[in-house]
Amino acid sequence: MRIAVDAMGGDHAPAEIVKGALRSIEQFDIEVILVGQPERIKEFLPQGEVPARVRIKEATEVVEMDEHPAQAVRRKKDSSIVVATRLVKEGEADALVSAGSTGAQMAASLLGLGRIKGIDRPAIVTVLPTLEGGKLLLDVGANPDAKPEHLLQYAMMGSIYAESILGIQNPKVGLLNIGTEETKGNELTQATYPLLQKAPLNFIGNVEGRAIPYGQAADVVVCEGFVGNVVLKTTEGLAGALFQLIKEKITATPLRKLGALAIKPGLKEIAKMMDYAEYGGAPLLGVNGISIISHGSSNEKAIFNAIRVAKECVESGFIEEIKKELPRFTAAQE
């Protein structure tokens, strides 16, 4: 198995990207193709030598975060994200991972890999930590102006991903809304609800945002990209602020510091559970290839886990499963 990694994408590229890639070949039986500028990549390789099961593919350009994604992808044919995507398209790699511009990765994936036939818009799916383990939320940013049929497709892809990757049998699918009643919501959610009811899914109805952290209502929560991105970033910010507040309060006095020692192991476990780096990357579902989007501030651990996610996606064959199941969903709507 070969994973193409955009070595030039991200706030800490190429250092943390290369470190994460090297860690992945120690843990997994894979080959990593580091795509980018060879002289910069080699600075972070042991003794500047390319180890076994690592290959460097030269790309002379980089799409910067402040560039217009689609325009940059079309203009910079030799950028690291375009070259990495091309490797997947041409069969030289089985998946790609990037912590660079999300918009550029989406554009490169759509232009280079194309959409799965029958999927109108791709969706970014992420795993959210909950009291019941990891649950899926999609879309978290690919398509901020979705239509009801798009949300139906997201629900189908999310359900297959939950079964294939998370091992959840017959996953419960919920529609993110402002209330649990069927009549709640805006035009989009009200039009989507009957489509999900009719679909061959384990649809449990509307889910409120406050139910997501508990993880009991649904295994897959579906929404348009604008709302999903707000939920994701609010969750990240709230988790960070909460841990900062806890740290300040439990170390405020000498007596509290003593008590903090007793609960430190538990706090470490919670911090690990809430750490985005543990979850690695978010797959772009709906494109005809495996494209894993990593956080722009990804460190070594996050890149390692993004490569792990890419490996699991390849092994699961979930893209072929989507292609196989799509006609059944289409027929149910006729």
Curated annotation (Swiss-Prot):
Homodimer. Probably interacts with PlsY. This is Phosphate acyltransferase. It catalyses: a fatty acyl-[ACP] + phosphate = an acyl phosphate + holo-[ACP]. Catalyzes the reversible formation of acyl-phosphate (acyl-PO(4)) from acyl-[acyl-carrier-protein] (acyl-ACP). This enzyme utilizes acyl-ACP as fatty acyl donor, but not acyl-CoA. It comes from Desulfitobacterium hafniense (strain DSM 10664 / DCB-2). The keyword Cell inner membrane does not apply. Keywords: Cytoplasm, Lipid biosynthesis, Lipid metabolism, Phospholipid biosynthesis, Phospholipid metabolism, Transferase. The keyword Zinc does not apply. Its EC number is 2.3.1.274. NCBIfam families: plsX. It comes from the Bacteria. InterPro entries: FA_synthesis, Phospholipid_synth_PlsX-like. It is found in: Cytoplasm. GO terms for cellular component: cytoplasm. Pathway: Lipid metabolism; phospholipid metabolism. GO terms for biological process: fatty acid biosynthetic process; phospholipid biosynthetic process. One of its GO terms (molecular function) is phosphate:acyl-[acyl carrier protein] acyltransferase activity. Belongs to the PlsX family. Pfam families: FA_synthesis (PF02504). It is an enzyme of class 2 (transferase). Its main location: cytoplasm.
